[in-house]
């Protein structure tokens, strides 16, 4: 199916809640058009505008667009083989030249991650209205960034980092989709305990909201790209690595049952996906290395 982004617009809900909406038109096989959008809460990410390469934000916008498409198109209804969907996407995005140069890598990466057939093309867009964020030392002193989903592996990753780096300060990167409230609740419960034991050793803001305006598909295979896109913004500013804490068994997701064959298994932290994404981060001139310290471990 043919898909194109149509506009970028900013809305202000409060002084500290400005949201970027990227509108998307999805043309279904029958010719009907679904209008969806990717909604990104800009606080606190707007603080880093002008402080890191622009390509860092383009990667965030790309991940949000992919997530919105992934969540808006039902697999069962629109797959070509019972699982995989075909997406021909025209993406209007800042810094499009760099993404266009590496579109083959991006299409390969997305197709492996979600189990779909992605054919993305990148074109320029009108400039996004600037967002002013007050200067702050809040993000200074960060020595590491770790994905923090609220699951057991991300909990262990945070604890290990703070235990092994007593003089360090870790940023726990989280994502929030209001259509899926479970992870945010888990994150909040864990942080209550962190405040007692690791006060001053970590930084965790309320999970950054990125969600589609339509929520029909729940497999969410593209979610990890968005997690990492959020993390790389902070890591690019702090000039540190990104820890992706996931035990090796889950990363590889062995096909131990028929339901886990091929792309039915999640590939969110699969070594192939992380290697492809690392190459993309490098060619875009961004800083962080992606590190999974538990790649050769299991629970």
Predicted regions and their residues:
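Hydrophobic positions on the alpha1 helix immediately C-terminal to the Walker A/P-loop
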Residues: 153-157
């Amino acid at each position: 199916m043919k898909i194109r982004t149509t506009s970028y617009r900013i809305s202000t809900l409060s002084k500290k809640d400005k949201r970027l909406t990227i509108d998307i038109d999805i043309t279904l096989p029958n010719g009907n058009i679904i209008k969806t959008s990717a909604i990104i809460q800009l606080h606190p990410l707007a603080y880093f505008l002008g402080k890191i390469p622009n390509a860092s934000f383009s990667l965030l916008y790309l991940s949000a667009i992919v997530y919105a498409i992934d969540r808006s198109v039902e697999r069962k209804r629109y797959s070509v083989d019972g699982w995989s969907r075909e997406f021909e996407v025209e993406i209007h995005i800042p810094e499009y030249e760099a993404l266009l140069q590496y579109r083959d890598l991006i299409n390969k990466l997305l197709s492996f991650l979600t189990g779909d057939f992605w054919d993305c093309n990148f074109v320029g867009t009108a400039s996004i209205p600037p967002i002013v964020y007050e200067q702050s030392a809040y993000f200074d002193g960060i020595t590491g960034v770790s994905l923090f989903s609220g699951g057991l592996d991300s909990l262990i990753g945070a604890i290990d980092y703070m235990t092994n780096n007593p003089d360090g300060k870790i940023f726990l990167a989280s994502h929030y989709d209001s259509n899926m409230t479970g992870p945010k609740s888990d994150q909040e419960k864990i942080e209550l305990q962190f405040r007692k034991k690791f006060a001053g050793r970590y930084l965790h803001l309320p999970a950054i909201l990125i969600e589609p305006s339509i929520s029909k598909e729940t497999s969410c295979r593209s979610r990890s790209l968005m997690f990492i896109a959020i993390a790389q913004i902070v890591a690019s500013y702090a000039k540190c690595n990104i820890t992706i804490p996931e035990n090796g068994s889950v990363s590889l997701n062995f096909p131990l049952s028929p339901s886990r064959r091929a792309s039915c298994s999640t590939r969110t932290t699969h070594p192939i996906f992380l290697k492809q994404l690392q190459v993309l981060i490098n060619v875009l001139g961004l800083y962080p290395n992606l590190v999974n310290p538990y790649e050769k471990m299991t629970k």
